[in-house]
A protein has these predicted regions:
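Short conserved motifs of the RecA-like P-loop NTPase core
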Residues: 31, 95-97, 108-120, 142-148, ...
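Conserved AAA+ ATPase "SRH/arginine-finger" region at the nucleotide-binding site
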Residues: 68, 82-95
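Helix-rich C-terminal "collar"/helical-bundle subdomain used as an assembly and partner-interaction module
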Residues: 161-248
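Short glycine-rich substrate-engagement loop in P-loop NTPases that contacts/grips substrate
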Residues: 1-32
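Conserved catalytic/switch belt of AAA+ P-loop NTPases
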Residues: 18-26, 36, 40-79
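C-terminal helical "lid" of AAA+/P-loop NTPase domains
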Residues: 114-120, 126-140, 148, 163-164, ...
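Residue-level signature of catalytic and energy-coupling elements of molecular machines
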Residues: 15, 50, 66, 81, ...
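Short glycine-/polar-rich loops that comprise or flank the Walker A/P-loop
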Residues: 30-31, 58-61, 78-82, 123, ...
Length: 248
């Protein structure tokens, strides 16, 4: 049996005491398997308790821990495990899988929608399938616009339009355009900055020097928002800075 655990906020003992779990042996083996998903959500103290449990039952159990950030797993656990790292899937692999899922579920998936799913998933197949599932729950025909709206992602051309407004139209039009993107796609300020940064390399109307300067402005804005700065004010400041850097 593979046990999938929810992220624990209060530690191993509290979660374990909430319900009784009976494990069956895996066929063909002499031990039991426990799978802990999102193990990096455990606090250091909870991981310390888990380490002791792993040692106590090492003769009868095998523990599999999955995480997004191995740096958040304490060294005492890492040193007792064989570490396997999985890279993001290639775009063609994600495309093939979501088309297969759509076909199996009788979902009409437009080609541009498939490309949008590949774009927003960043090689994460779980995210890709979830995006397809959410869109399909709203319409039997999954379109590109529907994917971007349901995943809270601004299309690349919209992001490029904001930067073009900074370059040619000035502060107020660019500011209105950015606010429109935030409202339309339900984006947080940090999400907007990250998406702008991701798409910056594909912007043809900026030279390398301008892209470097814009990247620095985005980094400063992201840092200030993470540190607690007001989102609206920081985004306005970023827009003003970008306009001064690349504007006519």
């Amino acid at each position: 049996m593979i046990l999938r655990s929810a992220p624990w906020a209060s530690g191993v003992s509290a979660s374990a005491s909430s319900r009784k779990i009976t494990l069956k042996e895996v066929p063909g083996t002499s031990f039991k398997v426990i799978f802990l998903d999102e193990a990096d959500a455990l606090t250091p103290d909870a991981q310390g308790a888990l380490r002791r449990i792993m040692e106590q039952h090492s003769q009868t159990c095998r523990f599999i821990l999955s995480c997004n950030y191995s740096s958040k797993i304490i060294e005492a656990i890492q040193s007792r495990c064989a570490v396997f790292r999985f890279r993001p899937l290639a775009e063609d692999q994600v495309d093939e899988m979501i088309r297969s899922v759509a076909s199996s579920e009788d979902i009409t998936l437009e080609d541009e929608a498939a490309e949008a799913i590949v774009h927003v998933s960043l090689g994460d197949l779980r995210k890709a399938i979830t995006a397809l599932q959410v869109a399909a729950s709203l319409s039997s025909t999954v379109t590109r616009d529907l994917i971007y709206e349901t995943t809270a992602t601004a299309p690349p051309e919209e992001l490029h339009g904001y930067l073009l407004a900074c370059k040619e139209d000035g502060f107020q039009p660019a500011r209105r355009r950015l606010k429109g993107l935030l409202d339309k796609y339900g984006l947080a300020g940090t999400d907007m900055v990250n998406q702008l940064h991701r798409g910056l390399g594909e912007v043809a109307f900026l030279d390398e020097k301008q892209k470097l300067a814009v990247t620095e402005a985005m980094a400063e804005t992201d840092y200030r928002m993470v540190e607690g700065g007001g989102e609206a004010l920081q985004l306005d400041a970023m827009t003003a800075t970008i306009c001064s850097l690349i504007g006519k």
